[in-house]
Every structure is written in structure tokens, then in C-alpha cells.
Amino acid sequence: MNRNSLFLVVLACALASAQNGGTTPSQTFHGWLSDAKCSRSRAASGLYTGTNPTCAKECVAGGAKIVLILPKEKKILDIENQDVARANLGNLVEVLGTTDARGKTIHIAALRLLEEGIAACERPKLSK
């Protein structure tokens, strides 16, 4: 392949990416909806679990953004369309959506409740 052909292939890929907004095809994710503040601090210590729903609702009411915590992937995604997620804040959900090219933001197309969150912090396991 000569340089001109290679350049045209790269240009075509860049244009195709720009046309779809740099998003990936729709994917399904399972995760917890929480506020960015609490979830990012927990993730920094290795915890990718649901957070206290009451606390998350208070933080979002105070201006924090809603995020999707992905426990299996050990990742947190920012949510582009916040209103879709607001009613299920603190819950475990299944989300169908597209992520940006960097895989850091998701646009939710559909959301399904899997399990309601409980207002409890991470507790140590009881010893027998």
C-alpha cells in the first residue's frame, strides 16, 4: 500500500468516526447509578459497588453528576443524559447505550431496574 492509499484509509476512518460523533455501537452494561463524588472516591480505594442511595440523592440535589459504576469492568462512566438516570439513582440497573470514543461517557438509550439499592454503607462481614 502506498502512502496516498494509506492516507485515504486513515482519512476515511476519521470522517466515519466524526460522522457518528465518535461513539461506539450500542452496548449493554450492568451497574450502579450513583453520584460522581462518592463513587470516584470509593473507586480510588478499589470499591466499585453501589453507594448509599440517600447520600447519592443528596449529592445530586447539591449539584453532583450521576455516574454509572461498572463493578465487573472496574470503571465509572459519566452519563451524558442525566435525566434518564435520575429516577433510578442508587439502584442496580441494566443500561443500553453508546459510549464516546474514549469510553468515559455514555448516552443511555434504555434503562431497566435490576435491584433497588439499600441505604447502607459498606459493612464488614459478620464473623461466625
Range-by-range predicted roles:
Residues 1-5:
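Positively charged n-region of N-terminal signal peptides that target proteins for export
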Residues 7-10, 79:
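Generic anion/oxyanion-binding catalytic loop in active/binding sites
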Residues 10-19:
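Hydrophobic h-region of N-terminal signal peptides that target proteins for export
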Residues 18-128:
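OB-fold and OB-like single-stranded nucleic-acid-recognition modules
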